[in-house]
Amino acid sequence: AFAGNPYLIDLDDLVKDGLLQETEIRSFNWGTDDADIDYATIYENRYKILRMAFSRFSAKSEDFLAFTEKSDRWLSDYSLYTALKRHFGDIEWQSWDVPLRDRDQEAVKEYQEILHNDIMFCKFCQYEFFKQWMQLKQYANSRGVQIIGDMPLYVASDSVDVWAHREMFLLEPDGRPNVVAGAAPDAFSESGQVWGSPVYDWNVMEEDGFAWWKARMLENMELFDVIRLDHFSGLVRYYTVSADAEDGRNGKWSKGPGRKLTDAMTEVLGDMRVIVE
């Protein structure tokens, strides 16, 4: 919900910063068909070349240190989670060793040391993404262009948000949801839909004044000029189905936080423009 996609890091900018050479970029296979994106190839080669750039980067730079301090609320968990995902072959976090799955502090500390370099690499990628994004936004705004950011209501089950904040979601002891978000049958789909995302425990979120949502909104306000809230109606009432359901026919409607959450978000939104969907 907070991190940027390293796929969007402009490698040419890394060349300008002296972290890469053009010949190094051309030495990788990025696909041969301009109309077809080979994401598997990009996944492997993108991270290989970003690691080359990281090997020449100084993690002691003032800008980098300022970014990591400012973003620490989410960056440390995200970087550890991403490093662990790669270390364990990209399997879902619910299948990790139980101590890590359950964020046992001794296990977390051990892997923070083991994967220190990988964790710093993840922080480097986020630093480069956000630096470039803010430069792009500034350029667009200076020419009268505003950016609309799409913010979905739910997050994926296999995500750092769920791993690091299990208490905020309706989950089984092993971290897997027994109910997931979906859509009831309607004119567009007679069988309904199963989205697969875990649903929030709104009662728990309310206890700290929806702090996670406020932080999420503040982060998005920096990135975009207008925020589009996808599935806004899910804040009023939401539809869930069994996690193993094949379709959305046999679901259940529940009451959402409604005005309690929107009032909390208004506290941080100020004059921010929002599109509701």
Residues of each region from the PLM?
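Alpha-amylase-like alpha-glycosidases and glucanotransferases acting on alpha-linked glucans and related
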Residues: 2-130, 155-277
